[in-house]
């Protein structure tokens, strides 16, 4: 645990330490146990510090982000991620325990799956599966209008409401796959669509979900309608 932000960050790191065990359990239940346990966590004291520790880039991409899992380098052939860490933004100190657990579980999944995830993996799917691991299966709101396409990386690119809805749609899709085909199939789909040397999305949908893009979209829409009606 690395404290870069003083007393408040120390309190946050203590809360992370108190909740890391349940996060490990949640990730293992979905992903398995073949991933490193030397978990590095960094708590930052300013937004600029967070952006630097998170890897830099345009400041807008870090707006509304509570934490991020990053690595300095990944060696896919050896399944090793070098310099892995979970970095918390300064605003994370004010999160409730339930919110902190969701963020911690989400980022720990990325940490666990990093060495098996391609650099060019569809981000929306990596985020949707991470949210499946992290978020409780709460009832869905009424979804209107129904999505006319699967989620995309562009849905997650813009800060604010668009990003929030993009994450929700990606999560709903991951829940749909797990609910209709089982969590093991969702894991297999992640590996097929996001793993090193992954297939393109239509091929992964065909090979793992046994459908085509139009069919899986129609099935997802029907699932969303059923869930919203509950």
PLM regions and their residue ranges:
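Acidic/His/Gly-enriched intrinsically disordered linker/tail segments
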Residues: 71-79, 98-103, 108-111, 115-230
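Juxtacatalytic substrate-recognition/specificity segment
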Residues: 1-108, 115-122, 140-141, 156-158, ...
